[in-house]
Regions:
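Short helix/loop capping segments that flank catalytic or ligand/cofactor-binding pockets
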Residues: 81-83, 96, 219
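Conserved N-proximal alpha/beta basic substrate-recognition cap immediately N-terminal to
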Residues: 1-68, 79
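Phosphate-binding site of ATP-dependent enzymes
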Residues: 90-170, 174-175, 179, 194-207
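Short secondary-structure junctions
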Residues: 51-54, 67-69, 104-105, 182-187
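C-terminal active-site "lid" helix and adjoining low-complexity regulatory extension at the edge
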Residues: 5, 9, 18, 198-276
């Protein structure tokens, strides 16, 4: 909670300092917002992912039958793993369908990535040079249960995160950034993916689990080994560059009512059944 508050207030402070409207934050990724659905649709965003990195997924319309289990049943939009369920068999999938039959949020089914490790790459685009990142952190999601195919998130008490950025050299970070740029021009994003190793990730051998475009949390701030001083420094660096890229939003970009539509949808998603 304290991290979130410091993120919010320092961002507002920097926006005021450079004379930009902090509410413009919600327009950073507005070109990728689906106004008719009122969400950043996972299906829309999935189409932006190059085929080599894309997991098989589809709307849960009952027409696709030959899934490789396990699969994850997800709301078409959600944050921090809200509403995600795992099915290890056809029977479990049908049980989940029955339990969520009354949900007004459409579901998608995504096959599991089989790579050994899970990573989260958080970045903010550079306002000075959009071919570069102003902030780029590489983090590993770990689960104390050691189970296969866990649903990791900041709300899962069994999940914790380690930042790996400092252990990577410039060449490795540049390669990872090149992969991230292939998805599209996102002002801010957090990409969840699975890969067998850092070397495999650098070489482009991975599958994308999810791309978060709506208030993505800088996961590196949750590394339990970070000192208070390191956290505060990272927060201020993040929000300073976030304010800069907010000011850099093109003036002719069509504004979308992202915040209010997403707030309403978020309330509905949080009412969905959660994985125990």
């Amino acid at each position: 909670m304290h991290i979130r508050l410091l993120l919010i207030f320092s961002y507002i402070y920097y926006c005021v300092r450079i004379k930009t409207n902090p509410a413009r934050y919600f327009q950073l990724n507005a070109p990728f917002f689906n106004p008719s659905k009122g969400i950043f649709s996972k299906l829309d965003i999935d189409r932006l992912i190059p085929q080599r990195w894309r997991l098989r997924q589809s709307a849960d319309n009952g027409l696709v039958k030959d899934f490789q289990f396990p699969v994850f049943v997800k709301p078409e939009w959600g944050q921090n793993a809200y509403g995600i369920r795992r099915a290890d068999s056809e029977q479990e999938l049908n049980d989940i369908r029955h339990q969520t039959a009354d949900s007004i949020m459409p579901r998608i089914i995504q096959e599991a990535a089989t790579e050994a490790r899970e990573f989260e790459v958080f970045y903010i685009l550079s306002a000075a040079d959009e071919t570069k990142s102003a902030v780029l952190t590489v983090n590993e999601a770990l689960n104390i249960t050691k189970t296969d195919f866990p649903i990791n998130s900041i709300n899962n008490s069994n999940t914790f995160y380690r930042e790996l950025t400092a252990s990577l050299n410039e060449e490795q970070l540049s390669a990872i950034w090149a992969h991230m740029r292939a998805f599209g021009r996102f002002g801010i994003s957090r990409v969840g993916l699975r890969s067998d190793s850092i070397d495999a990730l650098v070489n482009g051998d991975f599958h994308v689990i999810e791309i978060n475009l709506f208030v993505p949390m800088p996961i590196n701030l949750l590394d339990p080994d970070k000192t208070l001083k390191q956290r505060v420094s990272a927060i201020l660096n993040t929000t300073w560059h976030l304010a800069q890229i907010t000011r850099h939003i093109p003036k002719d970009q069509v504004a979308q009512s992202v915040f209010f539509k997403k707030w309403w949808v978020a309330r509905k998603v949080k009412m969905l059944p959660q994985t125990p």
